């Protein structure tokens, strides 16, 4: 399920499967603490939970999106492993610098380069998954492990140096 009347772009099945297969190949999900920032429907965080993550925090500033996240968590039987937070992404990262193992970063495609820089500087994670309409320059603090284009979507996996 996706939030109604919203310009949400749920990650396609093929992109999601390839992304999570890459995370699985690194052993990154088993027992992991995951942050699904710009959660939308929660599909990415729910996929992480279904593949062995111990906990996922879903952050979005749209209450309708968060209602959908809660419904999707309930429908999959994963509600006990999910924490749903209404907040603007950068404000959340500034207030709660809790370290996570994997951060799933799928902001709106209109997200600019400066916003990406701020986001990557603020997130406290070992690995990040970046989803965008273009290749993102991650800066010197990160090492890109994998980057692949799927039509209009570019997904990169990066590790903190």
Region roles according to the model:
Residues 1-161:
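Class I S-adenosyl-L-methionine-dependent methyltransferase catalytic core
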């Amino acid at each position: 399920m996706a939030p109604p009347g919203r310009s949400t772009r749920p990650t396609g099945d093929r992109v999601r499967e390839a992304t999570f297969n890459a995370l699985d190949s690194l052993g990154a999900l088993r027992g992991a603490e995951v942050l699904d920032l710009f959660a939308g429907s929660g599909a990415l965080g729910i996929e992480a939970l279904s593949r062995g993550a111990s906990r996922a925090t879903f952050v979005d500033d749209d209450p309708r999106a968060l209602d959908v996240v809660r419904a999707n968590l309930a429908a999959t039987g994963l509600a006990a492993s999910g924490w749903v937070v209404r907040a603007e992404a950068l404000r959340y990262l500034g207030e709660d610098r809790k370290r996570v193992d994997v951060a799933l970063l799928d902001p709106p495609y209109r997200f600019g380069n400066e916003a990406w820089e701020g986001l990557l500087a603020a997130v406290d994670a070992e690995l990040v998954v970046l989803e965008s309409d273009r290749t993102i320059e991650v800066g010197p603090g990160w090492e890109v492990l994998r980057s692949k284009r799927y039509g209009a979507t570019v997904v990169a996996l990066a590790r903190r140096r």
